């Protein structure tokens, strides 16, 4: 009997779960997914936490304790999310140890309202690193223009980073540079970088959602023929840049000092278009040294009927370039698409964060978002 998730892992794709909740932790569901579904990492974001806390009674005891202590809403959010992430880190500690620190990682995002404030982002990253106090933690920092120096400085301080909200190829180049600069600075400071890790989270399905809407407005046969092709082409060309960047003398010098490469991570891999196969953003993005983080529905769908037919990225670089040429020919401004998606991405996480603050404030018996 085939095991698609095991086959995916054997092809060099690390399977991560894009979800966390206290229910999932306390019922043993996460441990079961690690044991039986090849899951070797976890990602979270403000939207995931907002839904988890709003829909569960398992946070009530901690909320009562926080209320008695009189903590503010922001501190309460940090305490609650850090507790879940710490517990998930412990569930995955065996994976972390067995993989030499490559996998077994759990991600916790900085306050998304700091997306354009580098110094405060670094301070928040440091505080969360101290609060969770687990070596297999990733701090998530968005790849905004202002986020880039924060990524470098956080890594330079010896804190592992998941760079999130990457949509475009040029920004991905800048993320790789920020990563390498951070590793270089960490080495200059005398740090052991053998356990300093990073992933670059490239968002997939949202690209198709935005581009396909524009193609529908254009409405020509040429435009319609490009439907659902951009996101995969974009991710494939990102992997090509990854291969080139991590074959340079600059990287080889860092690797010789024990540094691990920053792996590409495919995020936003659930299909938003019901006409598409529900595993398309997994099966079409298979290459060694990558991570695919999936919501549980996508994970279980791939376990049920996913197919691994060898590599599906490197053989298709020329096809991907042709997609981008065709997009330009029909009038899609890909730079505007990327800028729109980054703005929307930051705003969505800010909105979820504010909802989360509101949920916690209500539970604590006070109003406002004084986080």
From Swiss-Prot:
Biological pathway: Carbohydrate degradation; pentose phosphate pathway; D-glyceraldehyde 3-phosphate and beta-D-fructose 6-phosphate from D-ribose 5-phosphate and D-xylulose 5-phosphate (non-oxidative stage): step 2/3
Major subcellular location class: cytoplasm
GO CC terms of this entry: cytoplasm
Record GO terms (molecular function): transaldolase activity
Active site per UniProt: 140
GO biological process per UniProt: carbohydrate metabolic process; pentose-phosphate shunt
Disulfide bonds: none
Signal peptide: none
Pfam families, A to Z: TAL_FSA
Catalytic activity: D-sedoheptulose 7-phosphate + D-glyceraldehyde 3-phosphate = D-erythrose 4-phosphate + beta-D-fructose 6-phosphate
Family statement: Belongs to the transaldolase family. Type 2 subfamily.
Summary of the function given for this chain in its UniProt record: Transaldolase is important for the balance of metabolites in the pentose-phosphate pathway.
Protein name: Transaldolase
Organism: Frankia alni (strain DSM 45986 / CECT 9034 / ACN14a)
